[in-house]
């Protein structure tokens, strides 16, 4: 198996921030320069976590994702603020090669089959930090998604990877 360097960025209020709390800017918060830096310095993929609180912020994030897709030379996957099939479509049309559904939200779990059938299994991933959640939805994940993005700070990666048939990408969310 070939190893890849997969980097991630959190978007909040049009800026790159350091984590899910969205309280601190990453460097100066300039999304475009950070994305270009990742692309130009060895990253193989960029994950974008949209931390929008409302639809207006989400539209701003979608515009940034469109701009990022024009200036980077690596695949990009995106997720966050997904409520329905249309939100998945917007991320794909903005330039994401894959969209990940937040499995902490029950509505996203229910959405999995519909978006997979509409856009193809290869375009859909899930994001979780819960072994129990993944175990409860194992059949759905295996049938309708092509990857698990595992927020692994509190989860055993090896045990989780053995649970599902699709690849598991561990992502540490620690800033230290």
List each language-model region with its residue ranges.
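Alpha/beta catalytic cores of group-transfer enzymes, especially the acyltransferase/condensing modules
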Residues: 105, 113, 117-122
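Active-site phosphate/pyrophosphate- and oxyanion-stabilizing loops and adjacent acidic/basic residues
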Residues: 66, 113, 158
């Amino acid at each position: 198996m070939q190893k890849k360097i997969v980097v991630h960025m959190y978007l909040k209020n049009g800026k790159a921030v350091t984590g899910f709390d969205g309280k601190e800017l990453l460097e100066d918060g300039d999304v475009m320069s950070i994305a270009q830096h990742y692309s130009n310095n060895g990253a193989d993929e960029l994950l974008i976590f949209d931390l929008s609180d409302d639809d207006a912020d989400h539209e701003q994030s979608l515009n940034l994702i469109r701009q990022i897709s024009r200036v980077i030379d690596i695949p990009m996957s995106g997720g966050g603020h997904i409520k329905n099939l249309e939100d998945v479509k917007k991320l794909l049309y903005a330039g994401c090669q894959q969209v990940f559904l937040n499995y902490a939200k029950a509505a996203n779990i229910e959405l999995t089959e519909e978006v997979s059938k509409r856009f193809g299994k290869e375009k859909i991933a899930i994001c979780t930090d819960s072994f129990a959640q993944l175990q409860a939805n194992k059949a759905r994940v295996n049938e309708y998604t092509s990857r698990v993005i595992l927020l692994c700070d509190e989860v055993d990666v090896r045990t989780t990877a053995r649970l599902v048939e699709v690849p598991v990408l561990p992502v540490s969310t620690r800033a230290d």
